[in-house]
């Protein structure tokens, strides 16, 4: 009895020890497993990139395990290291790898599976076209305007108060009526400026025209006086030839007075020409070509025709008697002194007192 009891006790103790050993080994195995919630999450993330199914499943497994180890490489020293076999064992507990290989093979060879059921074909096509699926997007035809309104509302909320102030200033800017009024005022000012320019141009043209006519009259008058003086000098010289001394003095005085009048007329003509040139330059600087037409008119044949009477007068003056011509040739020309032009002596009457 005792022995029996001892044997029973020993048998029960042996069974309990075996259970404890098995439990200890199980706990140690679970503790040494590299898989955790974080590692499984990284595994599923890598499965989305590298699918170890089909002909290239081993190459994809290399990339998958490398992705796992790279993620944990920056962790502390006790970070887990995953081998290819560890990953295959974990996937074998989660999926039917043989069934997935068959489905992948069927998807690659759809032409050889035409005799299968419609349900199987639909499942195979869904698996084969999984990579071609597009992300769901709301149709723009129905929801596009709502999206635009929401985007503009968010943008307006994020805008700075400075921008809002600038927009308010722009909105409170001048109205359309004020803009039209401003444009009309600008047009009036420009038209006034144009009118002023036209008036100034007209005044300048009339001034140039009057000066040109005055200069022509003075030139004509100076030449006529010179011709008349020459014509009147001829009978006087004829009378003065009766008395040699008196004739020589009167001839010198007349020649000197003629030279002085000629020099005065030349100086006056030079001053008028300079004034005329300055006025023409001012008008030319304003960018008008009307002054040129006035100057062209002055140099036209009609203006030249005004010198015809002078030529006829000169011809008449040159047609003088031979006696007076010889007397004029005999009379000596007046000599100028070094001090300047000699003043004319007072004219003496050549008529004899009766």
Swiss-Prot record:
Biased composition range(s): Polar residues: 22-34, 155-167
Record's compositionally biased regions (Low complexity): 277-286, 300-310
One GO BP: chromatin organization
Entry-linked InterPro entries: Eaf7/MRGBP
Taxonomic superkingdom: Eukaryota
GO CC annotation: NuA4 histone acetyltransferase complex; nucleus
Compositional bias per record (Basic residues), positions renumbered to this chain: 344-354
Compartments (UniProt record): Nucleus
Pfam families: Eaf7 (PF07904)
Location of region: Disordered: 1-34, 155-354
Biased composition (Acidic residues): 185-200, 221-257
Amino acid composition bias (Basic and acidic residues), ranges on this chain: 201-220
Keywords: Chromatin regulator, DNA damage, DNA repair, Nucleus, Transcription, Transcription regulation
Family: Belongs to the EAF7 family.
Subunit architecture: Component of the NuA4 histone acetyltransferase complex.
Role summary: Component of the NuA4 histone acetyltransferase complex which is involved in transcriptional activation of selected genes principally by acetylation of nucleosomal histone H4 and H2A. The NuA4 complex is also involved in DNA repair.
Descriptive protein name: Chromatin modification-related protein EAF7
Gene name per UniProt: EAF7
């Amino acid at each position: 009895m005792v022995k029996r009891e001892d044997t029973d006790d020993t048998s029960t103790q042996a069974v309990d020890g075996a259970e404890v050993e098995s439990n200890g080994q199980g706990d140690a195995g679970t503790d040494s497993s590299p898989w955790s919630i974080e590692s499984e999450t990284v595994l599923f993330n890598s499965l989305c990139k590298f699918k170890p199914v089909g002909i290239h499943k081993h190459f994809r497994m290399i990339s998958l395990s490398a992705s796992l180890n790279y993620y944990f490489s920056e962790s502390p020293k006790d970070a887990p290291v995953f081998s290819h076999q560890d990953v295959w064992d974990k996937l074998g507990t989660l999926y039917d790898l043989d069934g997935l290989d068959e489905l992948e093979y069927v998807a690659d060879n759809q032409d050889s599976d035409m005799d299968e059921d419609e349900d199987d074909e639909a499942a195979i096509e869904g698996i084969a076209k999984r990579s071609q699926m597009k992300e769901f997007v709301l149709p723009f035809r129905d929801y596009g305007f709502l999206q635009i309104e929401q985007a503009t509302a968010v943008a307006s909320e994020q805008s700075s108060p400075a921008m809002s102030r600038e927009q308010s200033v722009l909105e409170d800017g001048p109205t359309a009526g004020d803009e039209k009024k401003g444009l009309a005022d600008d047009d009036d000012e420009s038209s006034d400026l144009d009118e002023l320019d036209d008036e100034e141009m007209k005044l300048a043209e009339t001034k140039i025209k009057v000066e040109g006519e005055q200069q022509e009259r003075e030139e004509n008058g100076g030449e006529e006086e010179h011709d008349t003086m020459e014509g009147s000098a001829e009978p006087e010289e004829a009378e003065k030839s009766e008395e040699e001394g008196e004739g020589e003095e009167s001839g010198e005085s007349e020649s000197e007075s003629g030279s002085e009048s000629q020099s005065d007329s030349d100086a006056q003509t030079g001053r008028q020409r300079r004034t005329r040139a300055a006025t023409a330059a001012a008008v030319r600087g304003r960018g008008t070509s009307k002054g040129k037409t006035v100057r062209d008119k002055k140099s036209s044949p009609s203006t030249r025709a005004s010198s015809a009477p002078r030529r006829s007068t000169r011809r008449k003056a040159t047609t003088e008697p031979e006696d007076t011509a010889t007397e004029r040739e005999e009379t000596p020309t007046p000599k100028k002194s070094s001090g300047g032009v000699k003043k004319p002596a007072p004219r003496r009457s050549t008529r004899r007192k009766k």
